[in-house]
Amino acid sequence: MSSQTPVVTVDGPSGAGKGTLCMLLSKKLGFQLLDSGAIYRVLALAAIHHGVDTESEDALVPLATHLDVQFVAEGDLVKVILEGEDVSKELRKEETGMAASKVAALPRVREALLRRQRAFEAAPGLVADGRDMGTVVFPNAKAKIFLDASAEERAHRRLKQLQDKGLDVRFDDLLSEIQERDDRDRNRPVAPLCPAEDALVLDSTSMSIDEVVEKALQYIESKLAE
């Protein structure tokens, strides 16, 4: 990985606001964007499009190595472009999610996707959104942020999102799901969720998105000036 290209990593638990922060940072800095959480779904979708068996490492590794994908911040959304086509909606389909879990279980595919993610590092810079960006994927990144929020706050945010879509959900159920996922992510044997030693930890529980962006930008600008 080139030390010349500035890389900003944003890690943290589900629902902390990483996606929104990364999208806004990408726009403000003019940097490219990587949504690592979507990369397995993108590969699964590419496999479906090309008729590739989602359980065959031999077939998936070359597809992962040459995966033609871009993440584009547009308006309030991040568009996912696979082989020139906007596949943002397709990525959310249950079929894609099920195929993604099969793909993610294959060690050589994970290794190929790790290399593919690192290939996003290119001028003028990169904002990388994930759970192990600063610890595993880009350990030499110039600026590392760990964005956190209490489980209760993340459950409230998720509740509002789902209610805005007209869905009937219970706060207690969402909170349990978030706590279970946190426990899995923080205690998994490979690349557990934790801040890099040199990361700025931002707790967004009682901060607006504007405040989070302002603090993140101040930190990034100071790190890039070093």
Swiss-Prot record:
Binding site for ATP: G12, P13, S14, G15, A16, G17, K18, G19, T20
CDD domains xref list: CMPK
SUPFAM superfamilies: P-loop containing nucleoside triphosphate hydrolases
MF annotations from Gene Ontology: ATP binding; CMP kinase activity; dCMP kinase activity
Keywords associated with the record: ATP-binding, Cytoplasm, Kinase, Nucleotide-binding, Transferase
Enzyme Commission no: 2.7.4.25
Gene3D superfamilies the record matches: P-loop containing nucleotide triphosphate hydrolases
UniProt family annotation: Belongs to the cytidylate kinase family. Type 1 subfamily.
PANTHER family: CYTIDYLATE KINASE, CYTIDYLATE KINASE/PANTOATE-BETA-ALANINE LIGASE
Protein name as catalogued: Cytidylate kinase
